[in-house]
């Protein structure tokens, strides 16, 4: 792994939020600059990288994908090579916001995971296919519509008949507080801590089995505080990221989040800047997520 992962994560955050700034069509060239940056960072890890273009209202957009093809050791595990894990994050931000937490943290984590996986797997392959995908157009006015990058991606996977056994949406995941009362919840969600010092794994009912497996694997990595919830999709806030696109295609998917507007006071504002991120907690979180996802992928055969 990068010998200074904290510095690497902070570098990504600063580049996204301060060098590029807000990332949407209102800031000309920002989406292309971000896609190019992500592509270059993926390619530095040695992973196979590609852009997946889609057109919406006569404008081209790009999802950027890094691939780790699966190759099980044993013939009895051959089925695993047909199973895919998708780890994704959106790279756009709302107008007027540099989007350090939403969703610079998701993209910074995605880029760090690519570097981690290149080292963890080394000259071997994961048993399951792993795809790291940076999605365009999660924010309004594209959310849940035909211009949403993750929805285009998930639909294409479904058309191809791909067996996606897990999707993780890395969404607004760098703000933590030890202040009492710093954590809020949508109506109907009760019994959870009121101090916002944990990461949340958010699933729908159909993703409960994946949520339990994720809980078990994450607990083995460290004592990092976390909460899990499997809730109906109409629960306010539960569907508000790219995992929703995979739920629509009946794939199991989980949002990994600091809960965004239920905790983060700078959500969707001009004050969503890198200095708001708890870089120590964020670095520890990304490290633990990397080990969790690698365990789910499994160590397979040597590269051919």
Residue ranges and their predicted role:
Residues 83-95:
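Glycine/charged-rich beta-loop-alpha catalytic/anionic-binding loops adjacent to active sites
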Residues 72-84:
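Proline/glycine-enriched tight loop/beta-turn segments at coil->beta junctions
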Residues 11-73, 227-229:
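A non-catalytic alpha/beta surface segment that caps or lines the substrate-entry region
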Residues 166, 177-304:
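Active-site-adjacent substrate-binding region
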Residues 94-212, 235-238:
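Acidic/histidine-rich catalytic neighborhood of metal-dependent amide-processing enzymes
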Residues 1-32, 92, 264-272:
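N-terminal capping segment at the start of a domain
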Residues 65, 85-88, 131-134, 165-170, ...:
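Structural recognition of the beta-strand scaffold that forms the well-ordered cores
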């Amino acid at each position: 792994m990068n010998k200074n992962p904290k510095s690497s994560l902070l570098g990504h955050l600063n580049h996204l939020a301060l060098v590029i700034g807000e990332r949407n069509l209102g800031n000309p060239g920002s989406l292309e600059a971000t896609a190019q940056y992500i592509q270059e960072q993926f390619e530095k890890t040695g992973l196979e990288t590609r852009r997946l273009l889609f057109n919406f209202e006569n404008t081209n957009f790009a999802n950027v994908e890094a691939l780790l093809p699966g190759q099980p050791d044993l013939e009895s595990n051959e089925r695993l090579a047909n199973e895919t894990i998708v780890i994704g994050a959106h790279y756009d931000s709302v107008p007027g916001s540099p989007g350090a937490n939403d969703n610079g943290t998701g993209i910074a984590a995605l880029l760090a995971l690519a570097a981690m996986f290149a080292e963890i797997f080394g000259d071997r392959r994961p048993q399951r296919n792993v795809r790291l995908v940076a999605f365009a157009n999660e924010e309004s006015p594209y959310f849940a519509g035909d211009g949403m990058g993750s929805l285009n991606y998930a639909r294409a996977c479904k058309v191809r008949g791909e067996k996606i056994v897990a999707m993780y949406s890395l969404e607004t995941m760098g703000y933590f507080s030890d202040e009492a009362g710093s954590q809020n919840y949508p109506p109907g969600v009760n019994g959870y801590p009121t101090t916002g010092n944990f990461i949340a794994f958010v699933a729908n009912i159909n993703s409960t089995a994946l949520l339990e497996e994720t809980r078990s694997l994450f607990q083995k990595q460290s004592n990092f505080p976390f909460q899990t919830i499997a809730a109906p999709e109409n629960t306010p806030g539960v569907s508000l990221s790219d995992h929703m696109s995979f739920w629509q295609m009946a794939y199991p998917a989980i949002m990994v989040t600091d809960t965004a507007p239920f905790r983060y006071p700078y959500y969707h504002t001009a004050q969503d800047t890198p200095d708001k991120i708890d870089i120590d907690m964020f670095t520890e979180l990304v490290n633990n997520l990397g080990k969790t996802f690698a365990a789910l992928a499994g160590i397979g055969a040597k590269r051919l």
